[in-house]
Amino acid sequence: MKIFSEQLVEEARVACHVADLATATIGEVLLVAQYLETKTGIPFIRMDQGSPGLPANHFGVEAEKAALERGVGSQYPPAAGVPELKEAASQFIKAFIDIDITPRACIPTTGSVAASFGAFIAATQRKTGQNRVLFIDPGFPIQKSQLRVLGIEWREFDIFPYRGQALRAKLEAELADGTIAAIVYSNPNNPAWICLEEEELHIIGQLATKYDAIVLEDLAYFCMDYRRDLGHPCQPPFVPTVARYTDNYVLMLSSSKIFSYAGQRMALACVSDALFDRQFPALAQRYHDTGVFGSTFIASILYMITSGCTASTQYGYAEMLRLAAEGKINFVEDTREYERRAHRMKRIFTAHGFHVVYNHDVTRPVGDGFFFTLGYPGMTGGELLKELLYYGVSSISLGTTGSQQQGIRACVSRMKPELYEVLDQRMRAFHEDHGDGREEERVKSERVKSEK
């Protein structure tokens, strides 16, 4: 039995100015869910927005307060970032990834969204004719929205059928015309929670070097592949990264998930030292500067977007990174609650006819973490998103992430202990209304009609 009527959901769609629920953005789904909650007082199971569901790390809070009390709020922050944060970032990267990036090339940004926005500009303007972006999907929809704002063309492909060595031929075909300036993916992946394995990262790195494309590696969910014993500073296993296989990279690290510091909008764009020092005549001509990638990226691009990052927050982030690198903060254990939530939620959904869409990496099953993907027999992703709204569950369609698979993205961050039973009841009702042969009959009926 539906909780929200079709009429009421349609009222919410119109009131929130959503063109089509099947292709609704994260923000649009959020507005519809909030409208229905406010209108009825009935709580939603919120699986839409990937906002942290844990308290902010208190070490960061205290360090930020101390910085404000020292008076840092009265001065503009350096465009390249405060030295304490740059040093801590370099130390953190060495401790957990085991690669060397000097502090000068670790650049604070106002969230990873600002990092990618600036990196898209720098990457696509550095060489004439090499001005497109390639997405290894599924991915974060906002990054393509950024390219729409910038007027940058892109190509994309769903990695689902191209895992392992199959990635090489596909990637080579996409890069062969020489127009791709940047390659983008997240690892672990938003939305699928798949993790690229070493052979895949090796392929990406080799081909990025061959075709001189810059890899933008989004590490927002750093060390959150809980299948591996990550998070021990200066001890293997280290975080997998393309940085072992190419010098053409920008690593995007965020405070939002690993330290639950999303409200302060703080991240890092960590550029390889080799790329940081490369000189590009096209950048020099456009910006009337030296054309050196790192300095142009900082002073001529990022500074024009945000004019630096909040000084006090930089000190808070620096403290969290420093303590983590010294082994005094175990941020992996702090975030492991997401693994427990995902495991429990998956059990509920799969007990009621759902299946996990992206369920395997190359050599093992996908783990439990911040996101997972769900499909239901006979339904497209857009149809499933819309149907779940009637049962008080909000999500986003995989179609909006560049996926070619049918299903939805589920985020676990807003799940609360008291809602598991509610979720179970609602999904039982959903399956009673859609499963047990009903969907098979509908598909069969539609097939017969089409044959006529």
What are these regions (language model features)?
Residues K2-V9, A15-A114, Q165, L321-K328, ...:
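N-terminal small-domain helix-loop-helix segment of the aminotransferase-like
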